[in-house]
């Protein structure tokens, strides 16, 4: 269910197309190297040190079915063809190369070879300089600061990943998200029938401020038996960078107001995770209707806010924004 209308004004109140076009570049994911299944009895050659490069050994450790790196237990057929434990279950105990029965033979030699390897992070092309022992690399890659970001759009199961400039352009071009420049904002959310609340009626706006991008979320959902409205901000970057910023949200009317102040969450945290943690401005429906005039016929919420940067310890100019919440 969509909100009937949404108006937004910001400090500069201009679309940030030029800034985005300057930042945008094609985000190329690292494609996996496919090869024919030569990882047969060459395992013995690897174990005896006859293979010339680490790359050759790394190719032996690539599962011929899913092309992912193999981790113990590594299985092999009677002819020496190897595959990972996940794919063993998928191929119904038949070797995908020679079609012979797999059995329960482990390739201990290849597992031992893997222990001696040190390999770069798979996000090396994105800037990660780290090198890890083979069995430690996978754990690092799940939390690597250089790993791609997921699309922060909450209205669909979007599987797009990329760096921040790529995702900003993706949100604008593919999801038609509103883009604004400035560190203060003024939103008006209008809904004709406030009694109808489904999981989840929501809006998303992207702001460009201090050279960074922020996602402002506003949505209605059921919290227990009661419908609520929630607004929160996410920083398009890592958590350590997000801590450099603060934001405030204010909603009110008829002599009453609610104010929320906090640190934006990183888009590394999913939209649902932030929402379910209640880390934002939460407005109960009765209060929302009071702010709207109390006639309970139409929801009219005006949410204002600002983003500011903590002053630098080194004395550098923080460039704090002047609030404009009138």
UniProtKB/Swiss-Prot annotation:
Top EC class, one word: transferase
| Primary residence | other
User: Could you give one GO CC term from the UniProt record?
Assistant: multivesicular body
EC identifiers of the protein = 2.3.2.27
Q: What InterPro entries does the entry give?
A: 7-in-absentia-prot_TRAF-dom, E3_ubiquitin-ligase_SINA, Sina-like_RING, TRAF-like, Znf_RING, Znf_RING/FYVE/PHD, Znf_SIAH
SUPFAM superfamilies according to UniProt: RING/U-box, TRAF domain-like
> Which reactions are catalysed by this chain?
S-ubiquitinyl-[E2 ubiquitin-conjugating enzyme]-L-cysteine + [acceptor protein]-L-lysine = [E2 ubiquitin-conjugating enzyme]-L-cysteine + N(6)-ubiquitinyl-[acceptor protein]-L-lysine
Induction is noted as:
Induced by drought stress, salt stress, osmotic shock and abscisic acid (ABA).
Report the GO molecular function annotations. Answer: transferase activity; zinc ion binding
Protein family membership = Belongs to the SINA (Seven in absentia) family.
**PANTHER family given in the database record:** E3 UBIQUITIN PROTEIN LIGASE SIAH, E3 UBIQUITIN-PROTEIN LIGASE SINAT3
Q: What does this protein do?
A: E3 ubiquitin-protein ligase that mediates ubiquitination and subsequent proteasomal degradation of target proteins. E3 ubiquitin ligases accept ubiquitin from an E2 ubiquitin-conjugating enzyme in the form of a thioester and then directly transfers the ubiquitin to targeted substrates. It probably triggers the ubiquitin-mediated degradation of different substrates. Modulates directly the ubiquitination and proteasomal-dependent degradation of FREE1, a component of the ESCRT-I complex.
What name appears for this protein in its UniProt entry?
E3 ubiquitin-protein ligase SINAT3
Instruction: Identify the species of origin.
Output: Arabidopsis thaliana
The protein's gene is named: SINAT3
């Amino acid at each position: 269910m969509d909100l009937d209308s949404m108006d937004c004004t910001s400090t500069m109140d201009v679309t940030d197309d030029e800034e985005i076009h300057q930042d945008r570049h094609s985000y190329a994911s690292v494609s996996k190297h496919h090869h024919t299944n030569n990882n047969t009895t060459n395992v013995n050659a690897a174990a005896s040190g006859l293979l010339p490069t680490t790359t050759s050994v790394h190719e032996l450790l690539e599962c011929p079915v899913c092309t992912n790196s193999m981790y113990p237990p590594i299985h092999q057929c009677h002819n020496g063809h190897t595959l990972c434990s996940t794919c063993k279950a998928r191929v119904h105990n038949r070797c995908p190369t020679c079609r012979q029965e797999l059995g329960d033979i482990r390739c201990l030699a290849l597992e031992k070879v893997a222990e001696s390897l040190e390999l770069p992070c798979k996000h090396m092309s994105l800037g990660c300089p780290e090198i890890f022992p083979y069995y430690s690399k996978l754990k690092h890659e799940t939390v690597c600061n250089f790993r791609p970001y997921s699309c922060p759009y909450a209205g669909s199961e979007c599987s797009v990943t990329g760096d921040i400039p790529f995702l900003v352009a993706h949100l604008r071009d593919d999801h038609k998200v509103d883009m604004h420049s400035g560190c203060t904002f003024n939103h008006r959310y209008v809904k004709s029938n406030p009694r109808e609340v489904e999981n989840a009626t929501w809006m998303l706006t992207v702001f460009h401020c201090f050279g960074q991008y922020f996602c402002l979320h506003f949505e209605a959902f059921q919290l227990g038996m009661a419908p609520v409205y929630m607004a929160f901000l996410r920083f398009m970057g890592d958590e350590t960078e997000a801590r450099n910023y603060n934001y405030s949200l204010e909603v009110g009317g008829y002599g009453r107001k609610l104010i929320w102040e906090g640190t934006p969450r990183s888009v590394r945290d999913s939209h649902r995770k932030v929402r379910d943690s209640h880390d934002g401005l939460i407005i109960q429906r009765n209060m929302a209707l009071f702010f709207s005039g109390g006639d309970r016929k139409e929801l009219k919420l005006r949410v204002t806010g600002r983003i500011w940067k903590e002053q630098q310890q080194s004395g550098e100019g923080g460039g704090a924004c002047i609030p404009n919440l009138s």
